[in-house]
A protein has these predicted regions:
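Active-site phosphate-binding strand-loop segment of PLP-dependent enzymes
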Residues: 1-45
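Short, conserved active-site loop motifs that form the nucleotide-linked donor/cofactor pocket
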Residues: 3, 33, 59-60, 141, ...
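PLP-dependent enzyme catalytic core of the Aspartate aminotransferase-like
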Residues: 22, 168-169, 179-206
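Catalytic-core regions built around general acid/base machinery
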Residues: 22-30, 52-56, 89
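PLP-dependent aminotransferase class I/II
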Residues: 59-137, 144
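Conserved PLP-binding catalytic core of the aspartate aminotransferase-like
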Residues: 124-125, 137-169
Length: 206
């Protein structure tokens, strides 16, 4: 009852699943504090962004990034969206300097490439489905979690073993076995067609 702010990640990391929009709407409506929804992976999701709900709920903040679908993690650019009242409070406490001009120009340049970004996202989603189909056939894969992101969370027989086997082959995945409810889970980022071919070939050899 004393909670002032609630952070949610949808699509979630590391599971990749999205929260149901109706459930989120009810939560935002009933929660007395601020609700921040991190939509870093929203471009890969079949579910729409909740940005349109900002005008409906006074306690909603949406955050997004150019690190994922836009492939620009190096410029470290994130965005926050909310109503005028909340933004005015944030402006009072944030550092005095905004993003540098090089970052700003690069971001504006990339935002014009709508069709190219959509094409890249569709390619990743297509490769994700192919990768899932392959993973389902592996004996050491016990479960594949539904994903709305550009990665797949996979439960295997022994996450530490499989992680190290892949690492020795020059392939880095995320070992999430020490995270709560993720025992023996690996998070695999979906690569390009050629990268996935290498991954599939390597997994076949384990």
């Amino acid at each position: 009852s004393n909670t002032k702010i609630l952070f949610l990640c949808s699509p979630n990391n590391p599971t990749g699943n999205s929260f149901d929009i109706n459930i989120l709407s009810d939560l935002i409506k009933d929660f007395k504090g601020i609700v921040v929804i991190d939509e870093a992976y929203i471009d890969f999701s079949s579910q729409k962004s909740l940005i349109n709900l900002i005008g409906k709920y006074e306690n909603l903040i949406i955050t997004q990034t150019m690190s994922k679908a836009y492939g620009m993690a190096g410029i470290r650019l994130g965005m926050g969206f909310s109503n005028e009242k909340i933004i005015s409070y944030i402006n009072k406490i944030k550092p005095p300097y905004n993003i540098n001009i090089l970052t700003e120009n690069k971001a504006l340049e990339e935002l014009k490439k709508v069709s190219e970004i959509k094409s890249n996202v569709n390619s990743i989603l297509n490769q994700k489905e192919k990768l899932i189909s392959f993973l389902e056939k592996l004996d050491f894969v016990e479960k594949i979690y539904e994903s709305d992101a550009n990665f797949i969370l996979v439960k295997v027989d022994n996450a530490d073993l499989r992680y190290n086997q892949l690492l020795k082959k020059g392939i880095v995945v995320r070992n999430r076995t020490n995270q709560y409810l993720c025992q023996n889970c690996l998070r695999i980022t979906v690569g390009t067609k050629d990268e996935n071919k290498i991954l599939i070939k390597t997994l076949n050899e384990l």
